[in-house]
C-alpha cells in the first residue's frame, strides 16, 4: 500500500480512494493500522496525551440526541445543575495530580446561559492561577460570540463541540438542532482564537461512506483535536440496542481517521473499554491521546490500567503537555 509514505510525500487522498481502501476486505486491518502508526510515530513519536472529563451539569437538556443518556427522552437519569466553582477547581487538582494535560469541563444542555458562562469563566481564572499550564477545554453546547469572547478572556484553551456523525446521517441521530449548528459553533471558536476540538460517535448505524465523510469533514474543519467515541448503548435511548461494532472495526476506523488527519491529536474516547476490549492498546498505534477516568455518565477503567497500557506498549505519557512532571515513575515505569 505504502499509504503513509505517499501521505508524507504530500499526496492528498480522495474520499473515493479512502472508501475503497476502507471497504477492501483484502486489506488487513492490522496492515492498515501499521500505515497509520507510521504517521502517528512520525508526528507524535510514542507519546500519549492524557485528558480528563468533569461532568459539571448533568441531565438537564431539551435535545433529543439518540445516543445520549442525558437527552429529554430519558426519564430516569442523573440530574443536577451547574456545580459550585469549588468542585470544578477540586477536579482540576485531581487532573494535575494525575499528570493530565487537558481538563475538560462539560455541561449538559443546548447551550449555556450568560450566568453559566460567567460561572465557568470565573472558575477557569482561578484554575489558571493555581495550575497555569493545565489546558482547559470547555464543552458547553451552542454559544454566541460574546460568550466565546468571555471564555477566551478567562483562559479557556480549547472548545469541544462534536459533529458526532456525518451531515447526511445527522437527522437520524438528532432533530432538535442541525449539523450546521454544530459546525457554526466550532467556526465561532476558531474566530475567537480558541483551539477547536470536534469528533464523532461511531456505531450508530452510519454507513461506511458516512464514516469517511466524518473524517474528511473534520479535516476540512481543521479541528486540532479529534475524539473518536464508540457507541456505548444506553438503555432507553434510540440506539440503546445497537450492536454495530467489533474491536477490529473500531481499529479500522481509528486507522482511517489517522490517514486522513495525520497531524492532528486523535483521541480514543467514550466506549473504548466496551468496544475495543482487549484490543484497546492497539488503538494507540493510530491515536495519540486518551481520556483517563470516567466519562459523562458511563464509567471508565481505573487510571492505573491506562498508565500500564501505555507503559506496556513501550509508549510514554506526553509530559510536555502536562503541568505536573513530578514522580513520573509513579504512573509510567521505565522500560
Swiss-Prot record:
EC number: 2.8.1.6
Entry similarity comment: Belongs to the radical SAM superfamily. Biotin synthase family.
GO BP: biotin biosynthetic process
A Pfam family this chain is assigned to: BATS
Protein task: Catalyzes the conversion of dethiobiotin (DTB) to biotin by the insertion of a sulfur atom into dethiobiotin via a radical-based mechanism.
Residues that hold [4Fe-4S] cluster according to the record: 61, 65, 68
Pathway note: Cofactor biosynthesis; biotin biosynthesis; biotin from 7,8-diaminononanoate: step 2/2
Protein name per the record: Biotin synthase
Species this protein is from: Staphylococcus aureus (strain MRSA252)
Keyword Flavoprotein set for record: no
Record's subunit section: Homodimer.
Binding site for [2Fe-2S] cluster: 104, 137, 197, 267
GO molecular function, one term: 2 iron, 2 sulfur cluster binding
NCBIfam families membership: bioB (TIGR00433)
Reactions the enzyme catalyzes: (4R,5S)-dethiobiotin + (sulfur carrier)-SH + 2 reduced [2Fe-2S]-[ferredoxin] + 2 S-adenosyl-L-methionine = (sulfur carrier)-H + biotin + 2 5'-deoxyadenosine + 2 L-methionine + 2 oxidized [2Fe-2S]-[ferredoxin]
Keywords in alphabetical order: 2Fe-2S, 4Fe-4S, Biotin biosynthesis, Iron, Iron-sulfur, Metal-binding, S-adenosyl-L-methionine, Transferase
Domain Radical SAM core, residue spans: 43-269
Record note on cofactor: Binds 1 [4Fe-4S] cluster. The cluster is coordinated with 3 cysteines and an exchangeable S-adenosyl-L-methionine. Binds 1 [2Fe-2S] cluster. The cluster is coordinated with 3 cysteines and 1 arginine.
Essential cofactor(s): [4Fe-4S] cluster; [2Fe-2S] cluster
Amino acid at each position: 500500500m505504502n499509504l503513509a509514505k505517499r501521505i508524507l510525500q504530500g499526496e492528498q487522498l480522495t474520499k473515493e480512494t479512502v472508501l475503497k481502501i476502507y471497504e477492501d476486505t483484502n486489506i488487513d486491518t492490522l496492515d492498515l493500522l501499521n500505515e497509520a502508526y507510521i504517521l502517528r510515530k512520525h508526528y507524535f513519536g510514542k507519546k500519549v496525551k492524557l485528558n480528563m472529563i468533569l461532568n459539571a451539569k448533568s441531565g438537564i437538556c431539551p435535545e433529543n440526541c439518540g445516543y445520549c443518556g442525558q437527552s429529554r427522552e430519558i426519564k430516569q437519569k442523573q440530574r443536577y445543575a451547574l456545580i459550585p466553582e469549588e468542585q470544578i477547581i477540586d477536579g482540576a487538582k485531581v487532573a494535575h495530580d494525575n499528570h493530565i494535560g487537558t481538563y475538560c469541563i462539560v455541561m449538559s444542555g443546548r447551550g449555556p446561559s450568560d450566568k453559566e458562562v460567567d460561572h465557568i469563566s470565573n472558575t477557569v481564572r482561578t484554575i489558571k492561577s493555581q495550575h497555569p499550564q493545565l489546558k482547559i477545554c470547555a464543552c458547553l453546547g451552542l454559544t454566541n460570540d460574546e460568550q466565546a469572547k468571555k471564555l477566551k478572556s478567562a483562559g479557556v484553551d480549547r472548545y469541544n463541540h462534536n459533529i458526532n456523525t456525518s451531515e447526511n446521517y445527522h437527522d437520524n441521530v438528532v432533530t432538535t438542532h442541525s449539523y450546521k449548528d454544530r459546525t457554526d459553533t466550532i467556526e465561532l471558536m476558531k474566530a475567537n482564537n480558541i483551539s477547536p476540538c470536534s469528533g464523532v460517535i461511531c456505531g450508530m448505524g452510519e454507513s461506511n461512506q458516512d464514516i469517511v465523510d466524518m473524517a474528511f469533514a473534520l479535516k476540512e474543519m481543521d479541528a486540532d483535536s479529534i475524539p473518536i467515541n464508540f457507541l456505548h448503548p444506553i438503555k432507553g435511548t434510540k440506539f440503546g440496542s445497537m450492536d454495530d461494532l467489533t474491536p477490529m472495526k473500531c481499529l479500522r476506523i481509528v486507522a482511517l481517521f489517522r490517514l486522513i488527519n495525520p497531524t492532528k491529536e486523535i483521541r480514543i474516547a467514550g466506549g473504548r473499554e466496551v468496544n475495543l476490549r482487549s484490543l484497546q492498546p492497539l488503538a494507540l498505534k493510530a491515536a495519540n491521546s486518551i481520556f483517563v477516568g470516567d466519562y459523562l455518565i458511563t464509567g471508565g477503567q481505573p487510571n492505573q490500567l491506562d498508565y500500564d497500557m501505555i507503559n506496556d506498549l513501550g509508549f510514554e505519557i506526553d509530559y510536555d503537555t502536562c503541568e505536573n512532571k513530578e514522580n513520573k515513575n509513579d504512573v509510567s515505569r521505565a522500560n
